């Protein structure tokens, strides 16, 4: 069997790669190829998965659904010609007997259906949580957005219901249950976004009779997530630093350790240069939960800050709270059962529209404030309510699922494509 994976975005590429790597481990694994519809597909290249067609980085970075001006930039940048060439290639793949895995939204799903090949769909972009939760419809979404009875529109469900569509893998249990009501081949196997965060061999945990006292005096660890796009991430960083200042002012009686996870594609000097009033240190703080010799450490009264580009997972696992202006990273942090504070930026990705939608997707785990200066009091309010922290922990796991989804999807995919 031959399998072509279509994906349309950096995050989608990463999810696709996790599934394909698990497929490779299975007996009778298919011959695998990829075609990223947006961007250059570096995740595939890094995983040594061949890319079989034309790729190109677009000006929008894949956020054309957020802004019509971004779409026009992409059209001028060659989007239409690229899309036509990719569509022809997918059709040729189908004529040669290959199957297709579509990862993302309606674009790769449409490509897969129009090819005539057998296909499966991993729906990363949509969730019923945008419209409802387990208790019912959200009041603000019952109108136009929920008119068809699902976050997936009738034409999207039509594409999932064709006889060549062998399986649909939604991102959460709620979405799966709704799609099953429309007699679609939906499987609740989890969200691959949560795979690969925990170490393959966890560190041993030893009993410490002084653990309670240590917990009282240890620093509060706050993860800083400015996003991964230039120049938006640098603009977001300026807002995040206002929140950092606010926290240091309001938490004067407790030390705070800020962990800034900066994407490797960004210039760290731009973030370093903004730390006015911070003194650079020669070594990482003792409480820093990372092992990165390239990380930069800074301090000022009441706080410490670490800039790292090589310890993303360790930062996620080690932090208590996150100040986040990101997409995938925010969802992963929530999936660990931890609280997020967010405030809107100027975009094009993390604007108010995106941030508000994210709060619907992730529920109680994300608190959206209007300005950075509201961050400290929000954190204090959450810390003062243990029941709320417990609710946040349960909510995150429910909405994002447990690790191991990629392997479960891979096994089901191979089974359904072989029938």
Q: Which residue stretches match the model-derived regions?
A:
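Nucleotide-activated sugar donor-binding and catalytic core shared by glycosyltransferases
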Residues: 1-419
């Amino acid at each position: 069997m031959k399998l072509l994976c279509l994906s349309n975005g950096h995050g989608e590429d990463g999810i696709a790669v996790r599934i394909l790597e698990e497929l490779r481990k299975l007996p009778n694994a298919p011959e695998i190829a990829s075609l990223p519809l947006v961007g250059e597909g570096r995740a595939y290249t890094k995983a040594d998965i061949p890319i079989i067609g034309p790729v190109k980085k677009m000006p929008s970075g894949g956020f054309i659904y957020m802004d019509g001006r971004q779409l026009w930039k992409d059209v001028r940048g060659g989007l239409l010609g690229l899309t036509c060439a990719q569509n022809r290639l997918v059709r040729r793949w189908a004529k040669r007997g290959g199957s297709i895995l579509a990862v993302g939204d309606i674009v790769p799903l449409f490509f897969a259906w129009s090819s005539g090949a057998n296909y499966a769909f991993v729906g990363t972009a949509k969730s019923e949580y945008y419209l409802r939760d387990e208790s019912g419809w959200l009041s603000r979404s019952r109108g136009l957005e929920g008119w068809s009875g699902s976050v997936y529109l009738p034409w999207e469900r039509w594409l999932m219901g064709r006889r060549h569509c062998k399986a649909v893998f939604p991102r959460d249990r709620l979405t799966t249950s709704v799609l099953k009501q429309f007699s679609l081949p939906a499987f609740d196997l989890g969200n691959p976004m949560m795979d690969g965060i925990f170490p393959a061999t966890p560190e041993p945990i030893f009993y410490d009779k002084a653990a309670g006292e240590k917990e009282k005096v240890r620093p509060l660890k706050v993860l800083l997530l400015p996003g991964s796009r230039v120049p938006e991430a640098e603009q977001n960083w300026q807002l995040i630093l206002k929140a950092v200042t606010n926290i240091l002012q309001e938490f004067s009686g407790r030390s705070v350790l800020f962990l800034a996870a900066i994407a490797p594609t960004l210039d760290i000097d731009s973030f370093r240069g903004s730390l006015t009033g911070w003194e650079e240190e020669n070594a990482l703080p003792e409480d820093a939960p990372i092992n990165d010799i390239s990380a930069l450490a800074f301090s000022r009264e009441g706080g410490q800050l670490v800039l790292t580009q090589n310890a993303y997972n360790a930062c996620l696992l080690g932090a208590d709270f996150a100040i986040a202006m990101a997409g995938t990273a925010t969802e992963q942090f929530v999936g660990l059962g931890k609280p997020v504070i967010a405030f809107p930026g100027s975009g094009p990705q993390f604007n108010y529209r995106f941030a508000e939608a994210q709060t619907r997707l992730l529920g109680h785990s994300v608190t959206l404030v209007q300005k950075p200066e509201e961050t400290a009091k929000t954190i204090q309010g959450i810390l003062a309510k243990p029941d709320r922290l417990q609710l946040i922990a349960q909510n995150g796991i429910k909405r994002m699922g447990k690790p191991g989804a990629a392997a479960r999807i891979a096994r089901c995919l191979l089974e359904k494509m072989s029938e």
